[in-house]
């Protein structure tokens, strides 16, 4: 799905997404990402929600956003409290959503000037 937004050079904006890719400022990625408004997207080595560990959130924690939006794939799933305990201890809120809702919510909060992070889990690309 293409989003009709006004991307800026200043902020990292989700400009499109499908089940197996995400587009940030018109650049397509086919791997999981961590996105923050003022930082270039970072590859996130997570390809399966069920394999998440607390360690996977350290890169987000280091950026100290006010809120992490976790895109859990094609359907909404909730992270176990022990996985996000270190984020909560640092007063970083965590919201879990399917990827489409996560992308839309990130854009809205980013446009409002909120210090938000988006972590999107994409499936491993199929190799032939």
Where are these regions (language model features)?
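Mid-chain, well-packed structural core segment of small domains
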Residues: 61-97
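Short, charged beta->alpha transition segments
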Residues: 53-59, 105-106
